[in-house]
Amino acid sequence: MILAIDIGNTTVALGGIRDGRVCFVAHMDTVRTRTAAEYRAEMEKVFSHRRHPEKPIRFEGAVLTSVVPQITGALAECARHYTCLLYTSDAAD
């Protein structure tokens, strides 16, 4: 599954994509002062509702888009926590 993160001015959309199909979509509030650890805790809440004990969510890679540069780095760090492969522009590295 690919983790898709779309950072907007009011919400951060998270999606799981497998075999070209959207498996789930969830939203979190965009908070410019939130740290990577705080965003990761919010993401854990989202993923815990979609996790099955015998079949955990595993991400093979991630893609991140953002119009909020203040938090792009924090969410890129979160994406790297869940997968070692992150597709983004050089601005987030």
Range-by-range predicted roles:
Residues 13, 73-74:
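Phosphate- and divalent-cation-binding pockets in alpha/beta enzyme and binding domains
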Residues 43-60:
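Phosphate/pyrophosphate-binding loops at sites that engage ATP/ADP/AMP, CoA/4′-phosphopantetheine
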Residues 83-85:
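A short helix->loop->beta-strand "cap" motif at the edges of active sites that frequently abuts
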Residues 87-93:
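Conserved small/polar residues in nucleotide/adenosyl-binding loops
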Residues 80:
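Nucleotide and nucleotide-moiety/phosphate-recognizing core
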